[in-house]
Amino acid sequence: MNLHEYQGKQLFAEYGLPVSKGVAAETPAEAASAAGILGGDTWVVKAQVHAGGRGKAGGVKLVKSKAEIEEFAKQWLGKNLVTYQTDENGQPVSRILVETCTDIDQELYLGAVVDRSTRRIVFMASTEGGVEIEKVAEETPEKILKAIIDPLAGAQPYQARDLAFKLGLEGKQIKQFTQIFLGLAKMFKEKDLALLEINPLVITKEGDLHCLDAKINIDGNALYRQPALKEMHDPSQEDEREAHAAKWELNYVALDGNIGCMVNGAGLAMGTMDIVKLHGGQPANFLDVGGGATKERVVEAFKIILSDESVSAVLINIFGGIVRCDLIAEGVIGAVEEVGVKIPVVCRLEGNNAELGAKVLADSGLNIIAATSLTDAAEQVVKAAKGDA
């Protein structure tokens, strides 16, 4: 689960990290009045969306009057911001963050992530702040410094000092960096984070370190023990179909193709998309119905797939382990009848009671194409999507 920048900075402040004073406004009037609350004569206004690249898209602006703040808020509130990280529809803007201005001398990068290969939290730092870290990693990987956190010992001050020296920090900046590093490490563990980034972490004209941005991603599997963070969830930033799928414990990700896929198991779902692509098709989605695929969940899965108007055929690929294929077949039949599916449906069943499941489908009288193998299923659904079935 992602947080907005203003929410991330609230967390930073709780852990004693240096952040700008700011107000998250929901109306143009609130945004304009924020200038009086914050004081000063120059402010930064930022559209709040779960995407990077806001500055290049016009979603971040330096302003010098309340009128400019109000104009910016009117421009973006209720509209969608399109950046290189969003689709063509963009993300809806429901809040504007108004912040005090910071004089910048140098931009750095500081972030942390769970590294699956080492099974450790890894901190990354770089002198190349203010640009996409992925670009730095690709073009100049030697400029990314790392500190691996031992899960038993935790983050250590010497690791922070080592990074600070390599970043070229000196004097009081080393102490400030150490405090920021240890605060972030504590927050990462206590709040069950999966990723955090400060890009940029700046050195001000006065020589102090300051967190100018905040990107935070929380481990969705740990939200049950983070009720306060769960309340920060903004469903408007998610694809409507993905949000609906989550309510039914379905793992759904929208893609750009025209072949809907319904599969049990994430690995099989990825393999299914690969083989559809191999045979010339374009998957419209990733959809994992999970191990406990009931008729109700299959019905909802169909509804979600068919809500994508670009879908011209559906491939159901089920491997029966704990779940019996005959029960899945009954669920598919019930779903097709209830939803009123008008497009071709190809179904491949393997495993527990697969033969019985195939018989149930054959006896249903519905136009469901039974596949004998995964290759056959992919070939059939690609043909059907092209109208050759």
Swiss-Prot record:
Cofactor binding summary note: Binds 1 Mg(2+) ion per subunit.
InterPro entries in UniProt: ATP-grasp, ATP-grasp_succ-CoA_synth-type, ATP_grasp_subdomain_1, Succ-CoA_synthase_bsu_CS, SUCC_ACL_C, Succ_CoA_ligase-like_bsu, Succinyl-CoA_synth-like
Pathway field: Carbohydrate metabolism; tricarboxylic acid cycle; succinate from succinyl-CoA (ligase route): step 1/1
Cofactor requirement: Mg(2+)
Binding locations of ATP: 46, 53-55, 99, 102, 107
Chain residues that bind Mg(2+): 199, 213
CC terms in the record's Gene Ontology section: cytosol; succinate-CoA ligase complex
All residue ranges annotated as the ATP-grasp domain in the record: 9-244
Oligomeric form and interacting partners: Heterotetramer of two alpha and two beta subunits.
Family membership noted in the UniProt record: Belongs to the succinate/malate CoA ligase beta subunit family.
Official protein name in the record: Succinate--CoA ligase [ADP-forming] subunit beta
Species assigned in the record: Teredinibacter turnerae (strain ATCC 39867 / T7901)
